[in-house]
């Protein structure tokens, strides 16, 4: 079955694994999924990124993070913003602050995929891929 929106698929896999308290989840590897996973790791939402398989069948294995003795997921919500049918672009001043700065907006810019904070520091705008908090 063809996957028409790999970013939504990645976010859904992470969200479902997190809600079910799985240790890790597998996501089909691509440059975009690697970039998004790196931003999630830098922002403290996932613990570890590794790859398995080779060639076309390479998967990213994302080790999820939990907090406290009840293992509450660090990812409370993930929302896709810009979709294939409706792309959302923002300039530097228009970049959203998720939950007043507690969450992260992941932005695809001309300088690569980065968090909203990094995009503001570098003075670039771009496509708002998703919100994570």
UniProtKB/Swiss-Prot annotation:
One of its GO terms (cellular component) is ribosome. Disulfide bonds: none annotated. GO terms for biological process: translation. Pfam families: Ribosomal_S8. The keyword rRNA-binding applies. Keywords: Ribonucleoprotein, Ribosomal protein, RNA-binding, rRNA-binding. InterPro entries: Ribosomal_uS8 (IPR000630), Ribosomal_uS8_CS (IPR047863), Ribosomal_uS8_sf (IPR035987). GO terms for molecular function: rRNA binding; structural constituent of ribosome. Part of the 30S ribosomal subunit. Contacts proteins S5 and S12. PANTHER family: 40S RIBOSOMAL PROTEIN S15A. Belongs to the universal ribosomal protein uS8 family. HAMAP family: Ribosomal_uS8_B (MF_01302_B). One of the primary rRNA binding proteins, it binds directly to 16S rRNA central domain where it helps coordinate assembly of the platform of the 30S subunit. NCBIfam families: PRK00136.1 (NF001109). This is Small ribosomal subunit protein uS8. It comes from Synechococcus sp. (strain WH7803). The lineage of its organism: Bacteria, Bacillati, Cyanobacteriota, Cyanophyceae, Synechococcales.
């Amino acid at each position: 079955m063809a996957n028409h929106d790999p970013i939504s698929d990645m976010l859904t896999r992470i969200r479902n694994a997190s809600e079910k308290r799985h240790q890790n989840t597998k996501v089909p590897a691509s440059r975009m999924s690697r970039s998004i996973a790196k931003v999630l790791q830098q922002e403290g939402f996932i613990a570890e990124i590794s790859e398995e398989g080779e060639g076309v069948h390479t998967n990213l294995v994302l080790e999820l993070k939990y907090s406290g003795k009840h293992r509450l997921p660090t990812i409370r919500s993930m929302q896709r913003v810009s979709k294939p049918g409706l792309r959302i672009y923002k300039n530097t001043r228009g970049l959203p602050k998720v939950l007043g700065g507690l969450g992260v907006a992941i932005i695809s810019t001309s300088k690569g995929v980065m968090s909203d904070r990094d995009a503001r520091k570098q003075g670039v705008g771009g496509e708002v891929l998703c919100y994570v908090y």
